[in-house]
Amino acid sequence: MKWAEFRVHTTQEAVEPVSNILHELGAAGVAIEDPQDLVTEWSVKYGEVYELSPEDYPDEGVMVKAYFPMGATFKETIAEVRRRVHNLVSFQIDIGHGTMDYTEVKEEDWATAWKSFYHPVQVTEQVTIVPTWEEYSARPGEIVIELDPGMAFGTGTHPTTILSLQALEQAVKQGDAVIDVGTGSGILAIAAWKFGAESITALDLDEVAVNSAKANVALNSASDFVHVQQGNLLDDVASESADVLVSNILAEVILQFTADAYRVVKRGGLFLTSGIISSKREAVEGALKAVGFLIQEVNELDDWVAIVAQKPSQA
């Protein structure tokens, strides 16, 4: 079968929604070429950069590559990708150039090409993300999360995911009940379990993401503890049921459910939000305060923000 390498030239802000679109429409693998990886202060991320060459990266913006079979429905699939990517603008997401093209590639080439972008990366003091095909020996006390990036929505190395993992690492206590809204790959839910949470619910509206999360949860032998469900944000979630609520999704989506988040978090509990571009920090902080949350901490990495908000104990 013939395969196509489909390329989207976009912005860092749009990387995750663009990647999600590609996965939802059947991409067999997705790779991200971000020149920011060449200059980021990697000591902040704890990890090591592997084989990064400036020649492989665009001069500006981010290149997202996906691999599709060139079958009977290929043209329709590509047309739908273009439509959905351009539609991100209606959600106030800057897609930058937004140019898209594709080239034909041999099956043996694409099958290994995208894997070269993924290696073990230590993203917090305790956590290392390891692709399933890599042999890796954990250090004493190290927490290893295995992911299959070929099907993942968020592979652990995007700044928003790193910020979320760092916040979870500090927030989760032994025996906590944790809810992950917009779970994607399931990485945050898996991490919450490894940090000591007793009951973890992972929610996503998208069926492809739900299946991806379930597979990654199984890879980490966490299926008995992490319950992945299809659902729209916090609809039908019981009040005061989460010690920690975490959500790494776009600011525009977070703004839609701050009141529901306040309802679901227990008194004294925490709401950890990321996926927030710096320019939208004030809007999210304002919405959280408006429903009663207290802002405890704000952390930044590159142009992204994570907010730790607490529901008052006497709420």
Curated annotation (Swiss-Prot):
Q: What class of enzyme is it?
A: transferase
> In the UniProt record, which is one GO cellular component term?
cytoplasm
Q: Where on this chain does S-adenosyl-L-methionine bind?
A: T161, G182, D204, N248
Main location group: cytoplasm
- InterPro entries, per the entry: Ribosomal_L11_MeTrfase_PrmA, Ribosomal_PrmA_MeTrfase, SAM-dependent_MTases_sf
Database matches in Gene3D superfamilies: Vaccinia Virus protein VP39 (3.40.50.150)
Molecular functions per Gene Ontology: protein-lysine N-methyltransferase activity
Which GO BP terms sit in this record?
Answer: methylation
Record localization: Cytoplasm
EC number(s) per UniProt?
A: 2.1.1.-
Which keywords does this Swiss-Prot/TrEMBL entry list? Cytoplasm, Methyltransferase, S-adenosyl-L-methionine, Transferase
Under catalytic activity, the entry for this protein gives: L-lysyl-[protein] + 3 S-adenosyl-L-methionine = N(6),N(6),N(6)-trimethyl-L-lysyl-[protein] + 3 S-adenosyl-L-homocysteine + 3 H(+)
Q: Which family does it belong to?
A: Belongs to the methyltransferase superfamily. PrmA family.
Could you tell me what this protein does? Answer: Methylates ribosomal protein L11.
Q: What is this protein called?
A: Ribosomal protein L11 methyltransferase
Give the species this sequence originates from. Answer: Shouchella clausii (strain KSM-K16) (Alkalihalobacillus clausii)
Taxonomic path: Bacteria, Bacillati, Bacillota, Bacilli, Bacillales
